[in-house]
């Protein structure tokens, strides 16, 4: 009985950790989308692209990172459940 409760608690903690990470990821997306004009200008010069491209790439990169973390977390939970 206690091991089942412990497993449920661990799963809840893992899910909560993932939720908190995704929340901070969403805040990071918003911060990047509203980035300082100077930073966007420097990245634009470095990459040789337009400002719109630089601003659009930020959320895309964060989305890919978030998806990778989600996949790794799900794989970890599946392995732990076995």
Swiss-Prot record:
GO cellular component, one term: extracellular region
Subcellular location: Secreted
Keyword set, alphabetical order: Secreted, Signal
Secretion signal span: 1-33
Protein name: Colonization factor
């Amino acid at each position: 009985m206690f091991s089942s409760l412990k497993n449920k608690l661990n799963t809840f903690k893992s899910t909560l950790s993932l939720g908190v990470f995704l929340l901070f990821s969403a805040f990071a997306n918003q911060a990047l989308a509203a980035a300082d004009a100077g930073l966007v200008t420097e990245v634009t010069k470095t990459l040789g692209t337009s400002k719109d491209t630089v601003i659009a790439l930020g959320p895309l990169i964060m989305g890919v990172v978030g998806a990778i973390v989600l996949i790794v977390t799900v794989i970890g939970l599946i392995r732990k459940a076995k």
